[in-house]
Curated annotation (Swiss-Prot):
Bias kind Low complexity: ranges: 99-111
Comp. bias (Acidic residues): 60-69
Region Disordered: start-end pairs: 1-144, 167-225
Compositional bias annotation for Polar residues: 118-128, 172-182
Protein name as it appears in the record: Cilia- and flagella-associated protein 251
InterPro entries on file: EF-hand-dom_pair, WD40/YVTN_repeat-like_dom_sf, WD40_repeat_dom_sf, WD40_rpt, WD_repeat_EMAP
Species of origin: Pongo abelii (Sumatran orangutan)
Compositional bias (Basic and acidic residues): 1-19, 31-59, 70-95, 201-220
Subcellular location: Cytoplasm, Cytoskeleton, Cilium axoneme; Cell projection, Cilium, Flagellum
Role noted for this protein: Involved in spermatozoa motility. May also regulate cilium motility through its role in the assembly of the axonemal radial spokes.
Keywords: Cell projection, Cilium, Cytoplasm, Cytoskeleton, Flagellum, Repeat, WD repeat
Gene of this entry: CFAP251
Length: 1155
């Protein structure tokens, strides 16, 4: 069954029209068998024998079973009689011409039939990554037959009335998007109380063959009853309570979202349901959150790869629509009862701009979207039909401004209104004409001779002939809708609107305009909420709540309870003074606070207050389940992340934005760095100042804070490339923090600031790493007031820049620093000598690693099995240690599409936390290491995972060439012209390695070659004390894959070099003059001698044979004989250099950094 609401069974007639029939009660003879294994037997005889045994058992059951059978027979007769009566009634209605029918276009039927007949689905296909679908084939029949004639007849009769099991073919689109909702394409009624779940699945049944084989019906029904399979989908059979039931299934991902702190206060929050549980809907980054306030549970609607830009809900709160902005943008419709995505629109914006505004009709049949492109498009979607194209589309002129709000007429789903800040547009949809007409009168100050103000929101007036548009000047523009009289024979034109009057409601700007029951409701920038009747007369208001600017108002779908003697509804402000009876509602404010107002007694409850600005700083307590979250708005909040309980917070004075947070190793202190350079040391349990005054030794944002292992030192780094150190001293018998010294030690931004311990003592050591490729050690013992001593400086990279640094866990006898760089590499440096001991391919998920931490061990048994948690630009991931380049040892998931600002790991290693920066959220991820280990096991052993990194794999052309070059290097090292017996071995000398590397397309620099030599030579030195001077083919393959650029030679890297070295020529391209090009080769970087340069050009221009330099028998052209002025053009561009001079085949992958 598809995961959607089931519609009542339809009787299909020859003319292609359908009549809706009421859903029948299930027959009591449908009951589950006690031995479900019988359904899996394919042997017909064995199946029949089991049926005989069950029948004999049933005869011995007693009088109760006999009575049930008699009742079943009676129900069967009643069902048959009802069917006959309804068939007669339908014929009478059809004859009298009073039957309301929905027409299916012949072309649509034909196309759908062809699709159903030709497409075959795979039995293992998965829908939406959640529920597997069984194999469906309309021509395949099950061989199981019934022997009991009475049961056979009963099932045959029921199969014509009950909803049939969806075992027919479905299109791949239905599989992929799990969209079981169907409607005929004919015009639907404008006013209807029937919800879409009464129509879902209708189109597929309309397109079914009239006469399905009775044998298949019997077989389907029988298998369904025997196996206990529900005849209803999960979406149609669920209740509201199922969403928050605990999922006991085993996790299937290494990282699973368990909680999201914060919310996107620029989007609305909706009141989903209230009866037994208070449930809200809001957005965090790219995830929609369904939050149960009473249970303190969250359910996450995950499916978007970009930040969600808008969302809406149906009037009954059953259906949720979300949309995003960015590449491959999606529109997803969800079932709020189950959390299942019932339909996905993949190509809503082919240009990739995303959706700016969205609305759903009150009956939830149609969805309207407005794109966020420069030329906006208004589209109306019949989403219940699971179509991939809109029913109609309208492009808006750019002079209308950016339309950022849209809503349907609640009583006519063919009318809409939208507005930008300066223009309101009325739409009328003519479905039969495939036309979306619009009217957008120009409104200026001269229209009413008064200042109108900028529009905020618009709604349809309760009197059905007017539209209201609210402005930021506290006014309402009233528009009259002029509809031409309806005529069956002639078309009298499209409707249009005209500005009628300007009503000055209040002084405060109106930010929210909506309707509920018989009231028009406004919310303003001062936090006031006011209610007006249809004449725009004030009825009541809430002005004493002391709220921020109103961002959203969402009223409960449950009507207000009638007043009783115990009720405490306030009186309205009319002369009669009637009780102001109103639904409860949710209030969302621009300062990221959400409130619930119980109108009976006017009880305001604060549900949560979250940071209203970017969240860049998070830190986990070292031995308690606490997380501190800091925001640019100056708020620090501390949560217990085990029970999801907010504990305490502190809001600093205006202008102090929290940029960095770190607990000290004892967990007693919390260091906080601020955007304007201030450093606070706070008590971790109260957030009160530990020092009398904060430290102010920087003028720029403090980006890093770190404590030494004994909490005697604290170091900070800021955006002016400066490292500052603070020290704990004893003054007058009290321990106080004092400033020690600071030093601008880097030329570019500091990426890591790390304390460690010296191997020969327990003294702390301090290291800093910058994008200037410098690793700097500081001498804390020799430092004194205002003088921070530098111990040593080392270069970490040549072309790429380092991104982060962490102490490598003690998995080996050697102590390492693990440094990640912008070239997707992970490097291990000896902690003492700073020699690069190993270079490895790190996780490559679209951007380099930006931060990483070693996952704390959970037990002593796990000391030899360690893991890294890392973040890159938009993802969080896990990496199994030791890193060896195996791509199956890592996994990542999108956590914040617009960028990750920070990361933290719980003290027990169970959770990772990511801060989303400007998306104002922090996500908690549960770590399941067993899933990642399973992926490694499935990826293969030894070299199997590495073969997948080669073009063509183990049997491909590239690997064959690599083998040829490897063994050819043995011949060359022994001499090409030697007459002695060849000694073929499994190894080559290290001196041959650079030549083989270059022969297969990897051109390492001299520094990289030295790193490769050191890596191989000292690979076993610590364990054996011996140096290695040769390498075999498997080890060579690993070295090659770990050292080469992960995406090959890219034009982006060459273009970046020309951006730095070149000038802009007459064609607008970066170029280098020939003289400058030759001068750079012999003077900059790993410069050549002039002879080496000329020899290289001779080889590149084909003047020297291959292998000339190492094969004495070959003759070569002397470099002095080459005339470079003739061979090289006057100016050299990146394309000329790559293709004409070097002769490279360049990859089009140009989005990687550091290549």
């Amino acid at each position: 069954m598809s995961d959607a609401e089931e519609a009542p069974r339809e009787a299909t007639r020859e003319n292609g029209e359908t009549e809706m029939k009421e859903e029948e009660e299930p027959n009591p003879n449908y009951k589950e068998v006690e031995d479900p294994q019988q359904e899996s037997k394919d042997d017909t005889l064995a199946w029949r024998e089991s049926q005989e045994e069950e029948r004999k058992t049933g005869e011995e059951e007693g009088e109760e079973e006999e009575e049930k059978e008699e009742e079943g027979k009676k129900d069967k007769k009643i069902v048959m009689e009802e069917t006959e009566e309804k068939a007669g009634e339908s014929q009478e209605k059809e004859a009298s011409g009073i039957q309301e029918e929905t027409t299916v276009e012949p072309q649509e039927v034909t196309e759908s039939m062809i699709r159903l007949e030709t497409q075959i689905t795979d039995s293992q296909s998965v829908t939406s990554g959640i529920f597997p679908k069984t194999q469906r084939g309309s021509k395949s029949k099950l061989s199981l037959q019934l022997e009991d004639a009475e049961t056979d007849e009963l099932l045959r009769d029921l199969s014509t009335q009950l909803e049939f099991l969806d075992l027919d073919q479905i299109s791949p689109e239905e599989q992929q998007i799990s969209s079981p909702e169907r409607q005929p394409s004919g015009e639907l009624e404008e006013k209807t109380d029937q919800m879409p779940q009464d129509e879902l699945g209708q189109e597929r049944r309309d397109l079914e063959p009239e006469n399905r084989e009775e044998g298949q019906e019997r077989t389907v029904s029988d298998i369904q009853s025997k196996a206990g399979i529900s005849r209803e989908s999960l979406v149609s059979s669920t209740t509201e309570d199922i969403l928050f039931q605990k999922d006991k299934s085993a996790p299937v991902y290494p990282l699973t979202m368990t909680w999201s702190f914060g919310w996107n206060s620029s989007l609305p929050v909706y009141y989903i349901r209230e009866e037994k549980q208070r449930v809200l809907l809001y957005v965090c980054a790219h995830t929609a959150i369904i939050y149960n306030v009473f249970r303190n549970n969250q359910y996450h609607l995950q499916g978007h790869a970009n930040i969600i830009s808008c969302l809406c809900v149906s009037e009954d709160r059953r259906w949720i629509a979300t949309a995003d902005k960015g590449p491959d943008c999606l529109v997803i419709i969800w079932d709020s009862f189950t959390g299942i995505p019932v339909h996905t629109i993949f190509d809503s914006c082919p240009e990739g701009s995303g959706i700016r505004a969205m609305a759903m009709t009150h009956d939830a049949k149609y969805l309207a979207t407005i794109s966020d492109a420069e030329v906006q498009k208004v589209c109306i979607w019949k989403w219940t039909l699971a179509v991939e194209t809109p029913a109609c589309t309208l492009e808006l002129p750019t002079e209308y401004g950016v339309q950022n709000y849209v809503t349907f007429n609640p009583t006519n789903n063919k009318e809409l209104v939208s507005n930008s800040k300066t223009w309101a547009i009325y739409y009328a949809w003519y479905e039969e004409r495939d036309t979306l007409a619009h009217s957008a009168p120009l409104l200026t100050e001269k229209t009413f001779n008064k200042l109108v103000g900028k529009f905020s929101q618009s709604v349809f007036h309760l009197n059905l002939t007017q539209i209201l548009s609210a402005t930021m000047e506290g006014k309402l523009v009233v528009w009259d809708i002029h509809r031409p009289p309806s005529s069956a024979s002639t078309f009298l034109g499209f409707p249009y609107i005209k500005p009628c009057k300007l009503v000055h409601l209040q002084k405060e700007g109106i930010t929210v305009l909506t309707t509920t029951d018989s009231y028009i409701v406004t919310g303003d920038i001062k936090g006031n909420i006011k209610f007006y009747d249809h004449t725009l007369s004030i009825v009541n208001w809430y002005s004493h709540l002391k709220l921020g600017a109103i961002r959203t108002l969402s009223f409960s779908k449950t009507p207000a309870t009638p007043p009783t003697e115990k009720s405490n509804y306030p009186p309205d402000c009319t002369l009669k003074g009637d009780l102001f009876v109103l639904r409860n509602f949710i209030i969302g404010t621009s300062d990221a606070a959400v409130y619930h107002l119980t109108t009976d007694g006017t009880k305001l409850e604060k549900l949560f207050v979250e940071p209203k600005d970017a969240i860049c700083a998070i830190s986990c307590h070292p031995y308690q389940p606490l997380i501190a979250i800091g925001s640019i708005c100056g708020m620090i909040k501390v949560w217990n992340y085990e029970n999801k309980q907010y504990l305490f917070s502190r809001v600093f004075e205006k202008g102090l934005g929290v940029q960095s947070l770190t607990y000290n190793p004892e967990g007693a202190l919390l260091g906080a760095g601020f955007t304007e350079g201030t450093v606070y040391i706070l008590d971790a349990m109260s957030l009160e100042n530990e020092s009398p005054e904060p430290f102010k030794y920087s003028r720029t944002s403090v980006t890093h804070i770190s404590f030494s292992h004994d909490s005697q030192y604290m170091a900070t780094a800021d955006r002016s490339f400066t490292v500052a150190v603070y020290m704990l001293v004893v003054r007058n018998g009290q321990r106080v923090w004092e400033y020690l010294a600071r030093l601008r030690s880097h030329r570019k931004s500091i990426r890591s600031l790390l304390f460690g311990v010296y191997l020969d003592s327990n003294e702390p050591r301090l290291l800093s790493l910058g994008t200037d490729r410098l690793l700097i050690g500081y001498d804390l013992l020799r430092s004194y007031k205002d003088c921070l001593e530098v111990l040593d400086i080392h270069h970490t990279d040549q072309g790429c820049y380092p991104t982060c640094m962490v102490w490598y866990p003690p998995l080996t006898r050697e102590l390492f620093l693990l440094i990640c760089n912008s070239g997707y590499k992970v490097k291990l440096f000896n902690a003492t000598t700073k020699m690069c001991r190993k270079t490895l391919l790190g996780p490559a998920y679209g951007s380099p690693i930006e931060q990483t931490q070693v996952l704390p061990v959970r037990s002593m048994a796990e000391l030899q099995k360690r893991y890294l948690v890392f973040i890159n630009r938009d993802k969080v991931g896990l990496q199994i240690l030791p890193v060896d380049g195996n791509p199956h040892k890592t996994s990542a998931i999108v956590c914040h599409p617009n960028g990750v600002a920070g990361m933290a790991v719980s003290y027990d290693g169970h959770y990772a936390f990511t801060a989303g920066g400007h998306d104002r959220s922090v996500v908690q991820w549960k770590i399941t290491l067993s899933v990642l280990e399973a992926a490694v096991s499935l990826g293969g052993e030894d070299l199997t995972p590495f073969y997948g990194l080669l073009s063509g794999g183990r049997e491909g052309k590239f690997y064959r060439e690599l083998e040829d070059y490897f063994y050819y290097s043995q011949l060359r090292s022994q001499g090409i012209d030697t007459m002695e017996t060849r000694k073929v071995s499994e190894h080559i000398c290290l001196s041959e390695l650079p030549f083989v590397m270059r022969a297969i397309g990897f051109y390492p620099s001299e520094e990289k070659i030295d790193d490769i030599f050191n890596e191989i030579k000292f690979g076993e030195y610590v364990d054996t004390g011996k140096l290695i001077d040769k390498i075999n083919l498997p080890d060579f393959l690993k070295v090659y894959l770990n050292h080469k650029p992960p995406f090959g030679n890219t034009m982006s890297g060459i273009h970046k070099s020309f951006e730095v070295l070149g000038y802009t020529n007459s064609k607008g391209k970066k170029a280098i003059r020939r003289e400058d090009f030759l001068r750079l080769l012999v003077t900059k970087g790993e410069h050549m001698t002039e002879e080496e340069m000329l020899d290289c050009f001779a080889s590149l221009f084909g003047l020297n044979p291959e292998g000339w330099k190492s094969e004495p028998a070959t003759s070569s052209v002397k470099g002095s004989e080459i005339c470079l002025e003739e061979e090289l053009p006057d100016e050299i561009t990146a394309e000329i250099f790559a293709t004409e001079i070097l002769g490279l085949t360049i990859s089009e992958y140009s989005s990687q950094d550091g290549q």
